[in-house]
A protein has these predicted regions:
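Contiguous segments within soluble domain cores/interaction surfaces
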Residues: 68-69, 75-104, 143
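Proline/serine/threonine-rich low-complexity linkers at boundaries of modular beta-sandwich domains
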Residues: 43-48
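Extracellular/periplasmic metallocenter environments
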Residues: 34, 50-53, 57, 62-66, ...
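Positively charged n-region of N-terminal signal peptides that target proteins for export
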Residues: 1-4
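Bacterial N-terminal signal peptides
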Residues: 10-21
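Charged, glycine/proline-rich intrinsically disordered loops and linkers
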Residues: 105-109
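Signal peptide processing junction and immediate N-terminal pro/mature segment
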Residues: 22-35
Length: 163
């Protein structure tokens, strides 16, 4: 029993001599001071936005409030759906996004992703909470349909404005 414990300690020590210099294992540094934010600077509300997904469209308000937004995606369609949210840079359009996404088969590098719901089955729902600043955003379903075409090609994409 004692020799087994010594072997285990020796192996652990040998492993640590490899991992610590490699940066795999880090020791926690003591915190010298913490930043405390006054309650007045913390967000006080969360906006709730329901997005209805169907085959193949999103129904939601065209204008959303800035701040923390909790999205509830409801899949009213007969196909699987998801909702990704991207900030649309000022120098680009929804058409720019769609052209590049469909021709390259990947999200353009200039898009700023905020998050995506899980892929959900028909008659189910998913939630996604993000912080949105004023600007233009795209809601897009990035999965392929049964016929191989992307849901965005079939119209499951929507531009919204955040104010």
């Amino acid at each position: 029993m004692r020799s087994h414990l010594l072997v285990l300690l020796a192996r652990t020590a040998a492993l640590l001599t490899i991992l610590v210099p490699a940066g795999v294992v880090r020791t926690q540094q003591p915190v010298k001071s913490a930043t405390v934010r006054p309650a007045s600077t913390m967000p006080t509300t969360v906006s709730y936005v329901q997005v209805l997904g169907a085959d193949y469209a999103f129904e939601s308000p065209d204008v959303l409030p800035a701040g923390i937004v909790a999205f509830n995606l409801v899949n009213n369609g007969n196909d699987l759906h998801a909702m990704a949210i991207f900030e649309l840079p000022a120098k680009h359009t929804l058409r720019d996004f769609l052209n590049q996404y469909h021709s390259l088969g990947m999200i353009p590098t200039w898009m700023i992703g905020l998050g995506q719901t899980p892929t959900i089955a028909p008659k189910t729902e998913a939630f996604l909470t993000v912080r949105m600043k004023p600007g233009r955003y795209i809601l897009a379903c990035l999965i392929p349909a049964r016929d191989g075409r992307m849901h965005t090609e079939k119209g499951m994409v929507k531009q919204v404005t955040v104010k």
